[in-house]
Amino acid sequence: MASRMSMYSMASEALGGGPQAAQVSTTTLLNAIHNIYLSSQPYQLDASTSLVVNTWLTAAQAGATVDATLAARAWEHARRRAEDGCVILGSLHQSTPSLLVPFLNTFPFAIPASIYKSLEALQPFLRCVTPYNASAPRQIALGVTLTLSLGGNVTGASLALSQGGIDTENGLLNIPAEAGYRAFDVFYYLLTSASTPAEREFLGLKSPSAYALLARSGTYEPPSYLITADDGAAADDFRQALKEIGIKGSAHRNFISTLAGLLKLGNTLDYDADSDDFEEICEDVSGLLGMEPEVLMQQLSTEDRRTLVGGLYEALVDWVISKANSAIAAQMLRIRDGDESIDGRGVRTPTSNEDGDTVSITVVEVPEPSIGRALAMRTIFDDTIGINAEMIEDGVEVHPVGSSVVREMQQAVSDVAPDLGIMTGPQGRDRQHDLEKREVILEKVAYGSEDDSFVKKLLFPVEGEGVSLGRAGRFDLPALLSASRTWFHLSLHPTDDSPANLATLPAITSAWSAGTVSRQLRSWRLPEWANRRNRNLDYTADFDVDEFVGRYGALGCKDGKDGIETWMLERGWSNGEVFIGKERIWVREGPWWEAETMLDIKPAHSLQSMGQNPFTSGFDTSYSANPPNGSGFFPPPAMDNSLNGSNDQLMHTRNFSQGNMSQVTLNQHQNLNPQSAPSIAPSAMRNVQTTGDYGLGTKGDTYKGQVYYNEDGEFTGILDGELAKNKKIESKPLPFGRRAWIAFVWALTFWIPSPLLKFIGRMRRPDVRMAWREKFVLFFLIILINGMVVFWIIGFGKLLCPNANKAWNVKEVATHAEDEKSFWVAIHGKVYDITDFWQQQHSDTSIKVTKQNMLPLSGMVMDNYFMPPLNRACRGLGIKETTQLTFNDTITNPLAQHTSGFYTRDRTSALHDPDWYWKKFQPKIKEYYHGNLVWKKSKVKNEGENEQHMWATYGNEVYDLTDYLHTLDVNDNFDSYKFLNEDMVDLWKNSPGTNIKKDLDLLIANAKNETVSANLKNSWQCIQNIAYKGILDFRDSARCQVNNYLLLAFAIIICIVTAVKFLAALQFGSKRRPSPQDKFVICQVPVYTEGEDSLRKALDSLTALQYDNKRKLICVICDGVVVGQGNDRPTPKIVLDILGVDPKVDPPALPFKSVGSSSEQLNYGKVYSGLYEFEGNVVPYIVVVKVGKESEQSKAKPGNRGKRDSQILLMSFLNRVHHRAPMSPLELEMFHQVNNIIGVDPELYEYLLMVDADTCVEEDSLNRLVAACAHNAKIAGICGETALENDEKTWWTMIQVYEYFISHHLAKAFESLFGSVTCLPGCFTMYRLRSVDKGKPLIISDAVIKDYSVCDVDTLHKKNLLSLGEDRYLTTLMTKYFPEMSYKFIPDAQCKTAAPESWSVLLSQRRRWINSTIHNLVELMQLKELCGFCCFSMRFVVFIDLCGTIILPSTCVYIGYLIYILATGSGPIPYISLAMIGAVYGLQALIFILKRQWQHIGWMIIYILAFPIYSFILPLYSFWNQDNFSWGNTRIVIGEKGNKQVVAVDDEGFDPRSIPLQRWDDYALANNLPGRRGGYQEKTDYSYGDNYELDEIKSVYSAGPQGSVLTGMPGRNTYMPPQSPAFNNGRASTMGFQDSPMQHRQSMMSMGTGVHDMRSQSPYQDYPGQHPSVSNLRGQANLSPATGGGHSRSGTALGFSSGARSPMPDAMRSQSSFDFQHGHAGPNDMAIVESIRSVLCEVDLDTVTKKQVRALVEQRLQTELVGERRTFMDRQIDHELENM
């Protein structure tokens, strides 16, 4: 808890108030400076300026002199006034040491260690050695921004250079050619011995004298008068600092390569450089920088290279600063999470108050005296700008500045104008020209660099934005001063002597030169400064009148200026100390601190008893502490123990948190405010969770090692064995489908006895045993189907066509030609694989077996190479041993011809044996038999008939007599060669190519005598021995082809579906950016056991959505008070802490109906609401925490009913809102919070965005989803792409990346073509609440809610539908009841979610997904209306998906089989299967190649490697674990027989009367609340378009005055009608909160938006004198918290909001009513038309563009038109132009 006493109040004294009596002269000031120099003390020139004197000697030995009081004063103003501060560390002499680090050390809070490390790493880039300063900074300005919580602690920090950059001219490119000067220290550190030998060799480093940039002065060593002067030691420290800010590894290599490249490139800057050396240097430098040498040599001149060196060096420094800021942010995150202390050592306890409203203090070091002088003199003496101008305008009497001072000030500013961002004069134009030239050169170099080079990343830090050097990551120094409370800390130097001389002096304060010091005082006009400030302008705080009274009313200050003046006199303050201006109160430091001290010592209870708290009025939304209710819309309750009151009310809340004491709570203490409303629900549970933070119990508040779960994360409870004993027995009818299924299950599992399951399987309950039987049957059927599929694909074809894998035709044998590893040959109709034989030396002659001899034979038909002797092959035909056939084909390899018998060449060879062929060859070759050589029947017939190929078939065998007949032709039919029976030969001659079996058999059977018969038989035997060629190809038969054609048909179908999915995924063109939408959206986030990091990311992403903040509502529903694994407290407490709700808030627990069995339908919940701020976006939120009944509080998960119940809670609420039906007490409280507190009627919300708590939504996603729905009124549900946030975390996440991508871009894109996405994921889906045309409820319809809220989930099918796949089932129900609507997927809307990182979690997730998918697809198959017809319908696609999910294991088995076939070569290559697989993955690869998602190439490879996991392990595990549920004990199904289901009920049941229902109108009337709505029948004129009839709703968007937290919200695209009323029309809120000090000027820093003056910044208010500007039109919502300030002075280019104040008193301002019909949608059509006509009359139509016209029209209307308004404006512009 923050201390109420201030650090400042105890550590310092405030200055005396009032003008000082004596004038300050140069002499008196000089004397004072000498005194403080001797005593090492600071001197206060005025309340915001301190002077100190320092030398390097005093800084090194005694420590630098700095003013800690000034630091404390700046800190107090920042946190108390909620205003940004800026401390300028100015130097009046070139020899003063840097005070940046010493000054940071004086702040009264701890500075993170990473800031000092970052500065240590950065300083060598900015510091140089000069003769007058051993460490002279060369930057224009360096700022350290400290972001503080309003408790005063650091919550963030960053470093930045000013836009003026670095003086590289004097620090690098052109250092003075005098002894004592060096370039930036970093180059000497690079060249020291600290660099490793490997680095020196790689970089080619030499001594400093070898580099032209360093050699100009001849000075290479640091000054010797410094006792710590050692570049080597400094380099070691520097390298360590770099490592600690994250510059290590490849980043460090790139960094030193760039530095070395710059050094070497400096040697090319001389115009007379040697050409050979020049080319060598350019080659070397280009290698270091990653670019082509031609860029340096040919495309850049010498002057261009000079510019490149300076620009690239600045870009490198910017990169180092960005790395430093990342390291600081990482440490701040660890500090916030409690993982580290602020000094970087150890851990600490995280505090819950550091994530809220913030302010910033920026400490800016301006080392150059001329620049500091110009800044200071302009701030003090220029009365036309800044705070001086505001004071004068408000009536502060200021004496004019002397003309000489003005001229001197103007000359000082003119001398350094470009460094101050003033580009109007000659110097400015020259600077602008140089910057533009630098940008062109750097852009040329960047484009000439390699795509992944470090230089390109330096020059293009943000992809697609080009060179941003000097802008990105820099701050605008004048703009910073104009938007902050400025403090000056000026450092003088006592002498002009060189630093070396100081070391010889007797004392460290001996050096003194009055002339030197006097020159510094007079140069900066410090005497005039002191006199002017102390006489007129020394006011350090200013207030609005109401703001002043609100803050100090507790001290007796009365209303109005008269009351302030009276109180001022009572305090004894003169008009000079507190000045009452026209509109503001100006206070000097002394009186301000006196008043603040009185507030500090004032008891908190006395402040409360006065009816107000100064910490809740005027400043309560900025830095002060809110009362326990935290809202400011309810009266502060008395400090009563029953309300967990505390006397210390300074717990800082965050983000406008509506800690929201609800109406119920207030009603319990109506004596606090008689106008507060009574309870919503008379049945509010009084005794539930009344202790602990947020009223949610003590769990998580004190950690005592409570154990709620076992190791498996399951609740440790005991089941009652006597299931039906003492229980109520119910029975209900069973539908026919269920009865049939039960009968089928028992028919298949009757053989499994129930006692076995009960005692061995430990399934004591009948419903659990029945679920197991159902699971067993389903698993059996799935395995059976998978087995049938595998058998059909692999085995059925072989069964129909045996030996199909043993048949090869000539072409297939020829594929093994020249193949060493698969040596196939065909010999006499047989195919042999002689791979293991051919390399053996199998010849017994001189012929050697070599590759040259053997490989040409591979793949050949070798019949003629192995011809047996005819006299042996054709016995009985009288053939001589000298007779042989003459082959029709030429023998190409004679060495391979195996001629045996008579014609053997080598008589010693085994071939000389006439029986070699049968005795040797055939037995050996049979060992390598592989199959039959086959011939297509058509080929045999065609060649026989058309080509006279003398072959024919005998049955299935092919015989060829070509060689025999050719031998006869060659030998003129010589008798000795005519050995075959001529009648038999005539069969071949007369019928070639035909089947001669019948004729041949008949010829042999009808032989005339035995001699002829013997001759015929011998001839036939001879033909079989010498003419056999193989068999006919049986694989072409119908029996063998039917299975292939069936498989091919299904393959074609699958390919067509895949191809259509592919075409559906092809969406070319750029990513269109839709115009901003203006529909109201609820962002629902169901929360269960998520951790703080994921919850914060999810909420931050929703808050940062690029969507009108007022039109989105974050609705967080916490499913029970549950402590998640890894958390130290319940999830609801984590959520409320993130949102910034005060832990003291304890709203009542209100009853509502939950989705549960029996008595679990009664549940209680608590409601919290407020505003959450992130990165300048302030969004309303509502949190519903389900806390459970009183009887549940002792259980581990009180209130937990599941995600489906969380969805139903909100859907049911919106359903009742739509129908204006009676609501439960919880729903009434939700309505009250949304309608009256947040200020938006719930019926205005048109869309429901469902986001999981571990999902981060991209910024433009919501606008894209809404735009898609706005353009297509038929869309009822829409989802975007879900990508992985942790894709590279573990192996298990890696295998999911590709699957996520393809599942969206193939499956969902295909289904979206039909408008029938079957699964809208619950992690990122948006539903339309009601139809556009008739306002018909959709997602909130009665039918959907009824089916989705089934309470009795007691069967396996229901469990898988409603407990595992609720999101998919919700989509199924929407498709069922609204088939005419569309359900779309748009890839442009994206989100990121965290995938399971471990095997166990992945297994659990996929079990749920796969089983729910199957059961949901079964439901989808039963729907009657699915688009399409027959096989072209979505029903067919759903069937394909269902089959695909079921047969996943068989798919894996088949792919394994294919791999086996290919690896072993044991069968023909399945080309079709391989082509299909290639097509599927090829098309998928083509998708991400066309979408330029190159990274998915790698992810696809990983996915394919993990395919067995996805297709085999996960499905089988899922199928077997379909019954793996937690079964409730309340309702137990003890039997399903006949047509009845018997249920045992073990509790008191649910009585609907326990939840009282009440219509909102009745409740509002009874409690005097605004917002009467009327009944549903009164909605006849209701329109969901732009014409709302909602005056009676009294929302902030309706005509009536209704207060809400949105009144002060900054919004985008908000129409601000001129002269609209102040908040609440100047009247008190109807909620009974009478004090409204925030009506006019209110500090809004907690929004982080720069909204400071509600008269100019309220979304609905504007006043005369407020002129629109581009920055106004752009809005303030995207400014970071650091850019806003409580008192921003004037608009700047950075977009700081204007602080101009209207001179009109409040009474003169118009008090008109805000018209909702036009206010929420901007101006009407007529106003737009008039504005267009006016603009077109004023502009030059020949040069103006339509975009410019649109901008001018919007500027004239003071709003940005969106949606339909923008479309109307575009049409009207075209129309007006046509008519001109």
Swiss-Prot record:
What EC number(s) does its UniProt record assign? Answer: 2.4.1.16
Question: Membrane spanning segments where?
Answer: 740-760, 776-796, 1046-1066, 1442-1462, 1469-1489, 1497-1517
Q: Which domain of life is it from?
A: Eukaryota
Cytochrome b5 heme-binding domain residues are 805-866
SUPFAM superfamilies of this UniProt entry? Cytochrome b5-like heme/steroid binding domain, DEK C-terminal domain, Nucleotide-diphospho-sugar transferases, P-loop containing nucleoside triphosphate hydrolases
Q: What is its main location?
A: membrane
Feature: compositional bias, Polar residues: 1668-1681
Please give one Gene Ontology molecular function term for this protein: chitin synthase activity
Among InterPro entries, the record links this protein to: Chitin_synth, Cyt_B5-like_heme/steroid-bd, Cyt_B5-like_heme/steroid_sf, DEK_C, Kinesin_motor_dom_sf, Myosin_head_motor_dom-like, Nucleotide-diphossugar_trans, P-loop_NTPase
Question: Which Pfam families does the record cross-reference, listed alphabetically?
Answer: Chitin_synth_2, Cyt-b5, DEK_C
| Compartments it resides in | Cell membrane
Q: What segment(s) does the record annotate as region Disordered?
A: 1649-1691
Query: Its Gene Ontology biological processes?
Result: chitin biosynthetic process; fungal-type cell wall organization
* Keywords per UniProt: Cell membrane, Glycoprotein, Glycosyltransferase, Membrane, Motor protein, Myosin, Transferase, Transmembrane, Transmembrane helix
Main enzyme class: transferase
Glycosylation site positions: N133, N153, N629, N644, N655, N660, N888, N1009, N1411, N1524
**Reaction equations catalysed:** [(1->4)-N-acetyl-beta-D-glucosaminyl](n) + UDP-N-acetyl-alpha-D-glucosamine = [(1->4)-N-acetyl-beta-D-glucosaminyl](n+1) + UDP + H(+)
What induces or represses its expression, per the UniProt entry?
A: Expression is induced in the absence of chsv.
Gene Ontology CC annotations of this record: cell septum; myosin complex; plasma membrane
Q: Which SMART domains match?
A: MYSc (SM00242)
State the deletion phenotype. Impairs the ability to infect and colonize tomato plants or to grow invasively on tomato fruit tissue. Leads to hypersensitivity to compounds that interfere with fungal cell wall assembly, produces lemon-like shaped conidia, and shows swollen balloon-like structures in hyphal subapical regions, thickened walls, aberrant septa, and intrahyphal hyphae.
- What task does this protein carry out? Polymerizes chitin, a structural polymer of the cell wall and septum, by transferring the sugar moiety of UDP-GlcNAc to the non-reducing end of the growing chitin polymer. ChsV and chsVb do perform additive, but not redundant, functions in septum formation. Functions not only in the maintenance of cell wall integrity under different osmotic conditions but also in polarized cell wall synthesis. Plays an important role in the complex infection process of this fungus.
In terms of PANTHER family, this protein maps to: CHITIN SYNTHASE
Q: Which family does it belong to?
A: Belongs to the chitin synthase family. Class VII subfamily.
User: What name does UniProt use for this protein?
Assistant: Chitin synthase Vb
Origin species, per record, is: Fusarium oxysporum f. sp. lycopersici (strain 4287 / CBS 123668 / FGSC 9935 / NRRL 34936) (Fusarium vascular wilt of tomato)
